[in-house]
């Protein structure tokens, strides 16, 4: 439904991270006349690898920006929910030899569930965040989620698990602005975060040495690196540290093309490797997905065509989607795709609209399951 009330009658809670995107989101809403409250979420209790408590620094920046804008602010703590719903899943997936996407789960369970419920308990009409995505309320009562205008920053890939009910209460104030314009707005407004660099770490955990961090929670089990023919090429540090298509960190010398991770043999604790970026073993023609979510409540046909992304910032691939009787979804690619990775998200699009997504579970080539992939 299109919003008809005057902005001054609408209360919006903004999830503020201490970064420039959420700062500008709050600033724009305030400029547009909404009643705005800034809330900082603390979901992880730790210091980064330099001994700095990044959450404290980030909250200090939130306070500065909220004072500059002239809005109330406070912090909420969802550490237990984050551990139970996101981090436990993250570790379980790595244990199973897969490569999880914690940002997708964090958006589903924390930002747009626990935090959205908290915002609603404060009498908020909407929760706003600094995501690069757009909301379209102009249709037939259903809300659509569209790609962000800045194609390089579009974050609908990470928002694929949001439901119609969640989207009805969400605003993305910077979704129709390019990143460089967001920086410009922040600088012109004199916001404290205008020149702060973007974070690139794990959702809420921050930037740190990934191997060191993961080894605190999961014991590493070194083993052999082998070719598909069983030739031992060296040792790996633990299967959880590697992902499909990875080149760096293998330490295999010699002549010829670079070496890449082709798969994992979990039973033997072997990392499968091969030469060449376009190694045939890296390519597949279809996948099966689980935990599919569709943003619309309308019934889907049993088969339909659309486009898909299998990783963030990837160009769309035309696909055929088939809903199977057992609840799984089979997705066939128009042409073979490289390094489809179990545990990662597959996200579906109809033009500009993100129509949903799920988790890659099994990978196939010419209808034959690739057992070495996951």
From Swiss-Prot:
Could you tell me the keywords of this UniProt record? Answer: ATP-binding, Cytoplasm, Disulfide bond, Nucleotide-binding, RNA-binding, Transferase, tRNA processing, tRNA-binding
Stretches for region Interaction with tRNA: 153-155, 311-312
Its primary localisation, in coarse terms, equals cytoplasm
Q: Where is this site: Interaction with tRNA?
A: 131, 344
Q: Which Pfam families match?
A: tRNA_Me_trans, tRNA_Me_trans_C, tRNA_Me_trans_M
Q: Which GO terms describe its biological process?
A: tRNA wobble position uridine thiolation
Task: Extract the GO molecular function terms from the UniProt entry.
Answer: ATP binding; tRNA binding; tRNA-uridine 2-sulfurtransferase activity
Lineage: superkingdom: Bacteria
Query: Which enzyme class?
Result: transferase
Q: Where in the cell is it found?
A: Cytoplasm
Region spans: Interaction with target base in tRNA: 101-103
Known role: Catalyzes the 2-thiolation of uridine at the wobble position (U34) of tRNA, leading to the formation of s(2)U34.
Task: Extract the NCBIfam families matched here.
Answer: PRK00143.1 (NF001138), trmU (TIGR00420)
Q: Which family does it belong to?
A: Belongs to the MnmA/TRMU family.
Under which name does UniProt file this protein?
A: tRNA-specific 2-thiouridylase MnmA
